[in-house]
Amino acid sequence: MITHSDVAAYDRDGVVCLRQAFDAAWVERLRAAVERDLAAPGPHATNFAEGSTPGRFFGDMYMWRYDPEFRAAALDSPAPAIAARMMDSGSADFFYDQLFVKEPGTAHPTPWHQDQPYWPVKGWQITSVWIALDPIDRSNGAVEFIAGSHRWGVNYRPTPFRKGHEIKFTDSDLVPIPDIDADRTKYDIRWWKMAPGDCLVFHAMIVHGAPGNDTAGARRRGLSLRYTGDDARYDPRPGTFQFPHKPDLAAGAPMTCDLFPRVWPKAA
């Protein structure tokens, strides 16, 4: 149940943790889907840690295009309603899905970044629902957020997650993100201990990152489902990533299309 205080916290801080938003059945379905993807990775899979640190920081995206369980999570789980409520939007269109698995003993961090500068979309009503599939704390890579940073009014240059990917973002004329870790006391950094089925809902402009997984045996599997709301518009500007399937949208158009389906409200 989303409360008024949850919505107010999201608006103020840019992030909120919702407890047990996904029941045990959803957790088990998604864990099984993750293991299938790890065993037979999709065409967009990568190991973000490759070339920098030992371990495996597995990432994949667009799994909903070929896996029915990821598709069900994106379109039919509690996530669309959560996203619409938090965005204060009358509608929600599914944007894309992204999987992050930090295996034990993987020191590679998730760099501090905002999401929206990577994406060919503009607007305020853009959010992610990040579902925990394992117990998570800071030792195995809890996501950290700078509360209120979604309202700083600055777009930072996209930061590559993997060594050697810097060239992808050289077209961006945005300013580099500050060195947050050089003086963490300057910022209101938030993170949550999470249980499987908890989710984080966070604004596309909030500055966030995560440490590595320093544990010997605690995995950190997280599925992020991205949604856009009423005011979002397609914006394929230079320096953003391109989708593997080009959306049938003109620049400035609302996001709804076959690639970004309307998921809230549910069709009658």
Identify the meaning behind each predicted range:
Residues 40-52, 155-161, 196-201, 205-268:
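Non-heme Fe(II)/2-oxoglutarate
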Residues 114-126, 187, 194, 218-220:
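A short beta-loop-beta micro-motif enriched in histidine and acidic residues
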Residues 90, 116, 131-142, 148-150:
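Active-site region of the double-stranded beta-helix
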Residues 79, 89, 104-106, 136-138, ...:
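Short, charged/polar surface micro-motifs in flexible loops or helix N-caps
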Residues 138-207:
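Double-stranded beta-helix
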Residues 120-138, 193-196, 201, 226-229:
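Short, conserved beta-strand element in jelly-roll/cupin
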Residues 23-24, 100-102, 117, 136, ...:
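Short, solvent-exposed loop/turn segments at secondary-structure junctions
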Residues 1-13, 18-112, 117-120, 238, ...:
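Non-heme Fe(II)-dependent double-stranded beta-helix
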